[in-house]
Amino acid sequence: MNVCIYGVGRYGISTYYKLGRRGINIICFGDRNVQKQGYIVKDIRCIPFEKVLELDKNKTVIVVAIKQNNAQLVDMFREKGFRYVCSYNDIKDRADEKILLIKRCQI
């Protein structure tokens, strides 16, 4: 299972390290902010929102890692057809449980 972290700010970077330490395959960051697109963290590139929507909806976990409107973005990604979506708060509050679910593709 591949993971896209949506948001490359403080929460996104924190999520990257939290998941990366547990062996989760992070393929990209995503962000609507044009200034952040192309930003690279440890060889992981930030792609535009439109490119996030082109990812395989059945094989990509989207972790929404932003401070504001994260519940709305989780809902929006689900409406766009992504099967596996969670928020930074899910990872932060129940990290081990959620990471296990990510590995099993059961989010």
Feature locations, PLM:
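A general structural motif
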Residues: 1-2, 26, 57-59
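Generic secondary-structure boundary signal with a strong preference for alpha-helix termini
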Residues: 19-21, 55
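Glycine-rich adenosine-cofactor-binding loop
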Residues: 1-19
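Phosphate-bearing ligand-interacting subdomains
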Residues: 34-107
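Short hydrophobic segments within beta-strands
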Residues: 5-6, 30, 63-65
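NAD(P)-binding Rossmann-fold cofactor-contacting core
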Residues: 22-40
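Short amphipathic alpha-helical surface micro-motifs
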Residues: 10-12, 28-29, 43-47
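Structural/interface elements that position substrates and couple domains in central-metabolism enzymes
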Residues: 6, 13, 24-25, 72-79
